[in-house]
Amino acid sequence: MYEALKERFAEVFGTAPALLFSAPGRAELCGNHTDHQCGMILAASINLETVAAVRPVAEPRIRLLSEGYPMCEVDLQKLDPEEGEKESTTALIRGVAAGFAEKGVKPAGFDACVCSNVLAGSGLSSSAAFEILLGTIENHLTGAGLPAMELAKIGQMAENRYFGKPSGLLDQAASASGGVVYIDFAPGREPIAETIDINFEEYGYALVVIDSGADHAGLTDDYASIPKELHKVCGFFGKDVLREVDERLFYEKLPEVRAAAGDRAVLRAMHIYDENRRVHMARAALKCGDMETFLREVNGSGRSSQLLLQNIIPRKASDRQALSYALACAERLLEGEGGCRVHGGGFAGTIQAFVPLNRVDAFCAEMDRLLGAKSCHRLSIRPVGGVLLEVLE
């Protein structure tokens, strides 16, 4: 992949690249939709990556060619959001550059060719990997030295404000940090991040992500409904995020909250409270190598996402139940061993399974038969986040 990318850069720009950068996709391990409520998450950088061959330029502009897309060009003297760029690669480029400018760092111009083996629309966060890749490039070219969490915040801002998709900080933080990471997004302070040294295969399990075959196109309203409804719950108590609402008070006032915010909103709030506890338990389990407890929390997370959070079936297409089908097939094949859950934002994309090593080949073969060839992707943990891979000259 690297050599082909260098050759492509030379073809497009008429000169050789000077630098090679990489940023990983991510796997969410526990903490489904807790990030945008200032909750806790467990996630991991994975061995799938987005890579850029880069050459800095003196002009205040970025030209970027991403595999399978037309050339993007951004004038770094025009960094305000542009309505016509919503949901485009150009919007993310402009947004990340603007994020550096907002921190008092003049963004650097460069030419880049980008390719990726992070599956788009898969729940492995190809967009976050791209944002962290851009942030890593700018961080190096400008010498800004911003820490990983600041790059994550810039990526989140670019996705929310410029791309136009509501996003918590989980995806970007996991891609930027590297390894298995626990992050507490408690309001009023900087996020607390803790890296956990764990190799799932040493404990007898493979981490597998399964593509359900349904993509995320047209589902922005479904995603947006989750923070929107939770905001109704928070608003009842005069708060901005659920982390600020005392759980005991929430249950004391449950009939009134239900009347004000609606049934689904309170069910989703119940999920958030429970899910934060699951993250806490899963983190403690991983730190002491207790896979039984960890997998219990993984399965609990999956059940809660289905029953309470309700991010499995798209609202406008109830006949599209690819995630439910994939989860049912995985649970049947696991026969009570390991664990499985929805992976990422939900409604489409992928599910995640922890599969005993002695069953993983048969599991993947049967899931591929049931969902389509190459649906299963066996992943490994990548220990680093966004990084300069190579200086080429």
Question: Where is each model-derived feature located?
Answer:
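N-terminal pre-core extensions flanking Radical SAM catalytic domains
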Residues: 348-351
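Gly/Ser-rich oxyanion-binding loop with an adjacent helix/lid
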Residues: 1-40, 74-80, 85-202, 334, ...
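Structural signature of FAD isoalloxazine-binding scaffolds in flavoprotein oxidoreductases
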Residues: 39-58, 177
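C-terminal nucleotide
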Residues: 1-26, 51-87, 182-341, 353-393
